[in-house]
UniProtKB/Swiss-Prot annotation:
It comes from the Eukaryota. It comes from Aspergillus ficuum. Glycosylated; probably with N-linked high-mannose oligosaccharides. Keywords: Copper, Glycoprotein, Hydrolase, Secreted, Signal. Residues 606-614 form a propeptide. InterPro entries: Acid_Pase_Asper, Calcineurin-like_PHP_ApaH, FN3_dom, Metallo-depent_PP-like, MPP_PAP, PPA-like, Purple_acid_Pase-like_N, Purple_acid_Pase_N. It is found in: Secreted. This is Acid phosphatase. Monomer. Glycans are attached at residues 110, 161, 242, 295, 333, 340, 352, 408, 429, 512, 523, 559, 578. Coiled coil: none annotated. Its cofactor is Cu cation. Optimum temperature is 63 degrees Celsius. PANTHER family: ACID PHOSPHATASE RELATED, PURPLE ACID PHOSPHATASE.
Length: 614
């Protein structure tokens, strides 16, 4: 690609503000169905009683009337420096600025904070959805800053344009950096709805029993699996839903929900009991999943970062290219001679992380990062860093148009694009093939360099994609090339990830996957050997419609893996005890027991030092 062409394209594509907003290219028309629906038996938006069941989840605020015309359906909390952000969602606009009344006394909410609203032309719109309490299209952001640390505050969302006033709710602000008290965090990845009921139950329990916050490392809701129920079972995919004849990877017992007979007219398929993860509509998957999580996101901050399932409406075609026929030519239950899915195959509202950017609000703007993609925050003795393992680095899994073009092109042709093309969400100055050209790399370097290890001796980084695993994939090399050097240089203690749908704890690894034997005390205790090695944990077992991962033919455990569990679902509990010890525990979803534990120790002379890199 010519340098001038690349520069022009990157200027057009790069984000221009810290709070990224989706930019969707529409040079070529979308030619698929008005509303893609993954159910040939019931291809309706609201359901006709046939086909796959249509779920209903309670909204965050119970409406005061039986037939509301607007409602607050989702409420979620997230940290901002010295405060809290309150995000809430409604099907229709408020007719005024969103607001929150708040105070320290639940009987005297004597302060009011206002914010802003945003929306997108979702497919289908909420005006096409009959149930007002099951749809979100307007997203409201209210930040309350200047708050006291480690303090409980109360708040209420007032009624506006037909919504019902919320109950008086509460949140607890973050502990200040350096606070010596112990705390726990719920860490999860790859959580949909199907196969995640146990994880959800344990997560709700954790949220009510004092867990400080939840940290979800990508793949939220599995909205892009809306079409799994129309894909016939295939030999190269281990999931086949067929009632009591269903087959799933992992080797565990068949979940009860899979024993339900297929609805009349449906075929054995690559999906699950709902067709898609929760719904046969992309946007309804998002709506239902967020409402299912209300009893967590209302109680504790829910911090998120991007995964591959947030990028677009689909990742791949199915048998006989059934999705190409449907999305490109509006032919239901058809076939196509070739897989021809492109960036333009998805409805415009289902491209380029659009839903993800609207449905959450992370502290990118406040921490020098970008939107929900990369940001950091302190809590007590730890500094937490969320990075984007999907876009915005060289050879990223979801690349941008600049990597599609050839010759002197400034934009790719339709056929040169891929369905998951996304970003960049930060600025790019230089070649797209050099990670140091990307804003994210420079932000990460600056963020890690500023960490005061005398206050936050523990530094934990998470992205969706692992750097290493016994299940090797080429993206792991690119993630390492982008970030591993910085993490080692600045003495990061642990790198957390998901993407692979199992639990895999690795031995401490230095550059190029060298096992740091000096950091291994025993199989369940490591030293934080800052600058020499990093503890890597793959935490992708929360549960979703795709079930567990399996090794490909010829693969198996390698010597970097200390423990592998590809049978159980669950999340992980990270407990920071003090400046020299933390504990990591796998919490099994089926019974809440501990399936694995790791203690990470840090010598006191290292924990108190500010400079941990050469």
């Amino acid at each position: 690609m010519k340098g001038t062409a690349a520069s022009a394209l990157l200027v057009a594509l790069s984000a221009t503000a810290a709070q990224a907003r989706p930019v969707v290219d529409e040079r070529f028309p979308y030619t698929g169905p008005a509303v893609p629906i993954g159910d040939w038996v019931d291809p309706t938006i609201n359901g006709n009683g046939k086909g796959f069941p249509r779920l209903v989840e309670p909204p965050a605020v119970k409406p005061a009337t039986a037939n509301p015309r607007n409602n607050v359906n989702v409420i979620s909390l997230s940290y901002i420096p010295k405060g809290m952000h309150i995000h809430y969602q409604t099907p229709f606009g408020l007719g005024q600025l969103p607001a929150v009344r708040w105070g320290k006394d639940p009987r005297n909410l004597n302060s009011t904070a206002q914010g802003y609203s945003h929306t997108y032309d979702r497919t289908p719109s909420c005006s096409q959805v009959k149930a007002v309490t099951q749809c979100s299209q307007f997203f409201h952001e209210v930040s309350i800053d200047g708050l006291e640390p480690d303090t409980t505050y109360y708040y209420q969302i007032p009624a506006a344009n037909g919504t019902t006033q919320s109950e008086v709710l509460s949140f607890k602000t973050s502990r200040p950096a350096g606070h010596p008290g112990s705390f726990s965090v719920a860490v999860l990845n790859d959580m949909g709805y199907t196969n995640a009921h146990g994880t959800h139950k344990q997560l709700v329990k954790a949220a009510t029993e004092g867990t400080a916050f939840a940290w979800h490392g990508g793949d939220l809701s599995y909205a892009d699996d809306w079409y799994s129920g129309i894909l016939a079972c295939a030999d190269d995919w281990p999931v086949c839903y067929n009632g009591t004849s269903s087959t799933l990877p992992g080797g565990g017992p068949l979940p009860e929900e899979y024993k339900k007979p297929l609805p009349a007219g449906e075929i054995p398929d690559q999906g699950g009991p709902q067709g898609g993860d929760m719904s046969v509509l992309y946007e309804s998957n998002w709506d239902l999943w967020q409402q299912w999580l209300n009893n967590v996101t209302l109680k504790i901050p829910y911090m998120v970062l991007p995964g591959n399932h947030e990028a677009s409406c689909a990742e791949f075609d199915g048998p006989h290219n059934i999705l190409t026929a449907y999305l490109n030519d509006d032919i239901a239950n058809g076939t196509a001679p070739t897989d021809n899915l492109t960036y333009y195959s998805c409805p415009p509202s289902q491209r380029n992380f659009t839903a993800y950017q609207h449905r959450f609000r992370m502290p990118g703007p406040e921490t020098g990062g970008v939107g929900n993609f990369w940001y950091s925050f302190d809590y007590g003795l730890a500094h937490f860093v969320s990075i984007d393992g999907e876009t915005d680095f060289a050879n990223s899994p979801e690349w941008n148009f600049a990597e599609d073009v050839t010759g002197n092109e400034t934009l790719p042709s339709e056929s040169e694009t891929f369905i998951t093309d996304s970003g960049p969400f930060g600025n790019v100055n230089g070649s797209v093939h050099e990670t140091k050209s990307y804003e994210q790399w420079h932000w990460l370097q600056q963020d890690l360099a500023k960490v005061d290890r005398s206050k936050t001796p523990w530094v934990i980084v998470m992205s969706h994609r692992p750097m290493y695993s016994s299940a090797y994939s080429s993206y792991q090399l690119h993630v390492r090339e982008a970030f591993e050097g910085l993490l080692l240089k600045y003495g990061v203690d642990a790198y957390l990830s998901g993407h692979i749908h199992w639990y895999e704890r690795l031995y401490p690894l230095g550059a190029n996957g060298t096992i740091d034997t000096a950091a291994i005390v025993n199989n369940n205790t490591y030293y934080a050997h800052n600058g020499k090695s990093i503890t890597h944990i793959i935490n992708g077992m929360a549960g979703n419609i795709e079930s567990h991962s399996e090794f490909s033919d010829g693969e198996g455990l390698t010597n970097i893996t200390a423990l592998l569990d590809k049978v159980h679902y669950g999340f992980s509990k990270l407990t920071i005890f003090n400046e020299t010890a933390l504990k990591w525990e796998l919490i099994r979803g089926d019974d809440g027991t501990v399936g694995d534990s790791l203690t990470l120790l840090k010598p006191s002379h290292v924990a108190g030092g500010k400079k941990l890199h050469s």
